[in-house]
């Protein structure tokens, strides 16, 4: 059958193309994925930080990093995930990183995102992926906390490893008397996605921006649980009041203070008794403040 479109089909396709933005090649792209109405979704969950939600967000980030082409770094805080995408030709690892922001490759040009850099299709795919995976991991995390075991037919092999590695830690931190609250939210979380190009030098600044927002959100959420009147008070004032109550914010786990990231690391693995190197996505819940550790960030994205 001929693929040639009729006049009607051509006209309909023109309507679609009018809004189908195409990203240029060889440019850094930021993907921002946000939960829909998460203040309502998490209304009856543990406050100020819910371990089940945090677990699902962190592992959703890792899944997206591993399954979206050209992803170099992931960062999550609250109900959002930020991904840094760029092609391998954008940077030359042999160069001194001081020159990193002025190197402009011209030898080859690769697609930055799927679907030939089409923003509309990529955004819909990324939002769908986040929604699917978060709901899956949210359910697994709830089972880790409230159930002694999970049916083998309900969990994939890689999820079994996740179960074994995290169930004891989750059970230690999470209140275990409200299982039905979580069951009521199974398969109901949704996410949106947006993408935008940034200059190379602003890759790091975008993550700094999101991390600074994470710190503000963390202080505010923590303070609202213990201080009656937080209106008009800045972060330093809230921290001082929390300290007077014996609840210093800066003693919270680092991931609750300023988020969690994901990046690739070389790990030594063994096959038939012989070691070999392999890149693996790892979750870092003790990431530093990027603004004060820019070299650390550059090392991770390269």
Region locations from a protein language model:
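Regulatory and interdomain segments flanking nucleotide-handling catalytic cores
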Residues: 1-302
């Amino acid at each position: 059958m001929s693929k040639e479109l009729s006049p009607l089909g051509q006209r309909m396709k023109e309507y679609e193309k009018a809004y189908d933005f195409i990203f240029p090649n060889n440019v850094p792209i930021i993907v921002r994925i946000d939960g829909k109405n998460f203040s309502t979704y998490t209304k009856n969950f543990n406050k100020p930080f819910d371990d089940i939600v945090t677990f699902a967000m962190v592992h959703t980030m890792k899944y997206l990093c591993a399954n979206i082409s050209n992803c170099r770094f992931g960062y999550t805080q609250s109900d959002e995930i930020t991904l840094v995408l760029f092609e391998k030709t954008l940077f030359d690892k042999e160069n001194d990183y001081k020159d990193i922001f002025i190197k402009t490759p011209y030898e080859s040009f690769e697609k930055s995102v799927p679907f030939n850099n089409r923003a509309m299709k990529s955004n819909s795919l990324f939002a769908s992926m986040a929604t699917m995976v978060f709901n899956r991991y949210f359910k697994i995390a709830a089972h880790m906390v409230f159930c002694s075991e999970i049916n083998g037919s309900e969990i994939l092999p890689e999820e079994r490893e996740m179960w074994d590695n995290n169930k004891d830690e989750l059970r230690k931190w999470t209140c275990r008397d409200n299982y039905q609250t979580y069951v009521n939210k199974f398969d109901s979380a949704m996410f949106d996605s947006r993408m935008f190009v940034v200059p190379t030098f602003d890759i790091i600044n975008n993550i700094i921006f999101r991390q600074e927002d994470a710190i503000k959100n963390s202080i505010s959420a923590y303070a609202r649980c213990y201080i009656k009147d937080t209106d008009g008070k800045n972060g330093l004032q809230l921290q001082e009041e929390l300290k007077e109550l014996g609840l210093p914010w800066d003693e919270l786990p680092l991931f609750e203070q300023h988020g969690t990231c994901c990046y690739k690391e070389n790990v030594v693995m063994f096959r038939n008794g012989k070691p070999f190197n392999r890149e693996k996505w790892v979750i870092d819940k003790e990431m530093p403040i990027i603004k004060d550790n820019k070299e650390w960030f550059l090392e991770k994205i390269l």
